A protein has these predicted regions:
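The canonical Cys-X-X-Cys-His
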Residues: 32, 36, 59-68, 119
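Electrostatic cytochrome c docking/interface patches
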Residues: 28, 34-58, 72-75, 88, ...
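Acidic/polar helix N-cap motif
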Residues: 25-28, 50, 112-115
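C-terminal functional regions that serve as terminal interaction/effector modules
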Residues: 86, 107-108, 113-127
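Gly/Gly-Pro-rich "capping" loops immediately C-terminal to redox-active cysteine motifs
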Residues: 1-13, 18-23, 69-95, 105, ...
């Protein structure tokens, strides 16, 4: 719900999502959030041996997102099984400041593109 609200109110920028959410009521946003929260996501590809470099990098992620990308608090998203490309895009946006989160900016500020790729691959391979 928080992310849909951020798109609607212009606090998170994505031209398609901003246009889609514009004009929706709080109740409509809540209904959308409940619908999407109830869906079972498909995992990109579960592997027997996950990306080792990504596994090492996840140490910076587990306090909020859990060992395998399953959040420990409803304030933070589950990232297990999320698409690798999406995770990469979001981590780079936090790193370069085009997506705002003080916590995430501090965590990823020194990540290289390779580290972002590795940790994104690791979490994309985790089951829900």
């Amino acid at each position: 719900r928080a992310q849909l609200l951020a798109f609607r109110d212009g606090n998170r920028v994505d031209p398609l999502m901003n246009a889609t959410m514009k004009g929706l009521s709080d109740q409509e946003l809540e209904s959308l959030a409940q619908h999407f929260s109830s869906l079972v996501p498909k995992v990109s590809s579960i592997v027997d041996k996950p990306n080792q470099a990504g596994m090492n990098i996840r140490a910076r992620c587990i306090s909020c997102h859990g060992m395998q990308g399953k959040t420990v608090n409803d304030q933070w998203p589950n990232i297990s099984g999320q698409k690798k490309g999406y995770l990469q895009k979001q981590l780079k946006a936090f790193r370069d400041g085009s997506r705002h989160s003080e916590v995430m900016a501090v965590i990823v500020k020194d990540f290289t593109d390779q580290q972002i790729e590795d940790v994104s691959e690791y979490y994309s391979q985790q089951s829900h």
